């Protein structure tokens, strides 16, 4: 159990960058501190698999939301009283090793922040508290890919809006005022409609493969899309419309002074997206995961490497 005494001593919030759930978690924690009259700790957004994460310097009393200390160096944080709240399967050993709280299919980073930061600290009107609870729930529905949830459409809308507005906007909004949930959902619905229109063209142009793995036939779709912020939704649309068992989408980014290829994986459960991502040093959940590979790989090389790895992992 995370105590209020431990929370009020936090020196820095570290949250998952470029992720609606990570943005949501940071907003929730920041709002919780503001509600007590405290100056909220500064927030540092970091992405898994980047130099900033791998080379992170350990400090006393850091609060990790939807992310952990580096998986290969986490023991350096022992004795520094970190609070670690994460739900990524590949980081479970870090969370448990540092006596943090590991989530499940109903507790993403935002829900963990709500239950373990806002609930112990909160001092706000019930209506505002309930709005943050709803916000956390929608972040969780989207991040854990609960497509059958009646809240799926709103969860997608919220994710689009958070990515467009940006992580710094999110933290500042939590500092200066009430949660603008209705405005975010209204913006997100418009964005979602635009993304769905884009998705129809991607379905037509996606590369399709039928993989024979043991006694199974696995249907695979692969596509490239320049906008990393919308690739998850388009992958989900492709999976439903083709239909197929697993979708692999990739795009290129410039980070750590180099070009890298970011690969996003979506699965219907027939193939574990997490197992595939972890084999490349990434992570995620069984139906939604991701990883990074060298940015100088050609599209044909990416297709060959990924399809070969899927076959190897599922023989």
What are these regions (language model features)?
Residues 149-208:
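Accessory alpha-helical/coil subdomains and C-terminal extensions
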């Amino acid at each position: 159990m995370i105590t209020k005494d431990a929370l009020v001593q936090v020196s820095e919030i570290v949250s998952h960058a470029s992720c609606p759930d990570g943005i949501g978690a940071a907003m929730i924690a920041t709002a919780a501190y503001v509600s007590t009259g405290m100056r909220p700790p500064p927030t540092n957004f970091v992405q898994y698999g980047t130099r900033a994460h791998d080379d992170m310097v350990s400090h006393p009393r850091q609060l990790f939301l939807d992310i952990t200390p580096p998986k290969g160096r986490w023991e350096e944080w022992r004795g520094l009283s970190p609070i670690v709240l994460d739900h990524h399967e590949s980081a479970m050993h870090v969370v448990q090793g540092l006596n943090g709280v590991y989530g499940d299919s109903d507790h993403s980073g935002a829900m963990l922040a709500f239950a373990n930061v806002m609930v112990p600290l909160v001092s706000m009107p019930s209506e505002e508290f309930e709005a943050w609870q709803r916000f956390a729930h929608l972040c969780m529905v989207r991040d854990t890919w609960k497509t059958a949830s009646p809240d799926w459409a709103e969860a997608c809308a919220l994710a689009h809006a958070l990515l467009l507005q940006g992580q710094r906007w999110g933290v500042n909004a939590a500092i200066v005022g009430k949660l603008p949930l209705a405005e975010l959902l209204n913006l997100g619905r418009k964005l979602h409609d635009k993304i769905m229109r884009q998705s129809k063209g991607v379905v037509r142009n996606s590369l399709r493969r039928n993989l024979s793995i043991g006694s199974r036939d696995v249907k695979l779709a692969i596509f490239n899309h320049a906008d990393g912020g919308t690739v998850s939704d388009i992958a989900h649309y492709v999976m439903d419309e083709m239909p197929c068992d697993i979708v692999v989408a990739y795009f290129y980014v410039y980070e750590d002074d180099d070009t890298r290829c970011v690969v996003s994986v979506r699965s219907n459960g027939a193939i574990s997206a997490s197992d595939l991502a972890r084999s490349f040093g990434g992570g995620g959940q069984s139906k939604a995961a991701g990883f990074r590979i060298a940015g100088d790989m050609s599209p044909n090389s990416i297709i060959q490497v990924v399809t070969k790895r899927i076959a190897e992992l599922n023989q």
